[in-house]
A protein has these predicted regions:
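Mid-domain alpha/beta scaffold segments of enzyme catalytic cores
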Residues: 1-258
């Protein structure tokens, strides 16, 4: 989720409490830039149920970046991932060269920070860019199993490429959309030990809440229920597995919650 979004401003605690009431015990506020990472860390330090990441979203790659701030956020135990980073070929701006330059700069720094002892998993943003992005990630030398392709909206062929690379895949409310059957088919392909769910809120409200704006972390329950249906599992069985996966991938504490 993106708890730092302006649509949540002033009601962040209310959003977290609503999620807790729905059974969502922990969440990660994903950063889109260096200033946003600092704001996400402040939320995470104020509430033990919230964690954060540190990175630059490709659609923010033409904005000012303070690499020292990203590094400082990354030193906090409340920061559990680098990113989100990657490439977005759906929009023309920022231009492809700028996106690639910032991606390369981030990966280079993550390699260096990992060598310093700040090894963290990496949240990847990929939109219409899987074939272009995978060689870049491979060339970084970072372990494939430390990457998660978040908010996956591509079809089975791209999902197979990501899985062959060795990365994880995370799905949003898009798997509940009747007009996105290819994404549900991708979800069917992903092994249960390499899958996660998310909201990407305030965006992409899942069915049956699709008309609700903004999307909120509490609605991740609907995403998990749809993934359970795709795999023919009881929701509570899959939800326990998803908790285990998030704990294992992000190093989250095990609080015993469903």
């Amino acid at each position: 989720c993106h708890l730092t979004s302006k649509v949540f401003r002033g009601r962040e605690s209310e959003v977290v409490e609503a999620a807790a009431a729905a059974g969502v015990s922990r969440m990660i506020s994903i950063a889109v830039g260096s200033e946003d990472a600092k704001a996400a860390l402040a939320l995470a330090e104020a509430d033990p149920r919230v964690f954060c990441s540190a990175g630059v979203h490709p659609l923010h790659s033409d904005e000012a970046i303070d690499w020292d701030d990203l590094h400082r956020v990354g030193t906090s135990p409340r920061c559990v991932a680098w990113g989100e980073l990657g490439l977005d070929r759906h929009y023309a701006r920022p231009d492809p060269a700028t996106q690639r330059r910032v991606l390369d700069a981030q990966l280079e720094r993550i390699v260096a920070w990992t060598a310093e002892g700040l090894a963290k998993p990496i949240v990847v943003h990929s939109r219409k860019a899987v074939a272009e992005l995978l060689p870049v990630l491979r060339e970084s030398g970072l372990p494939p199993e430390r990457f998660v392709f978040h908010c996956f909206t591509d079809g089975p062929a791209d999902a197979e490429q990501v899985l062959a690379f060795g990365a994880w895949i995370s799905f949003t409310g898009v798997i509940t959309f009747a007009n996105a059957p290819e994404v549900a088919e991708s979800a069917r392909l992903v092994p249960l030990d390499r899958v996660m769910v998310e909201t990407d809120s305030p965006y992409l409200s899942p069915e049956p809440h699709r008309k609700v704006r903004p999307n909120e972390p509490k609605f991740v329950v609907a995403v998990a229920e749809r993934l359970a249906s795709i795999h023919g599992l009881a929701p509570e069985v899959l939800e326990a597995r998803l908790d285990e996966n998030a704990e294992r991938f992000f190093g989250l504490p095990n609080d015993g919650a469903a």
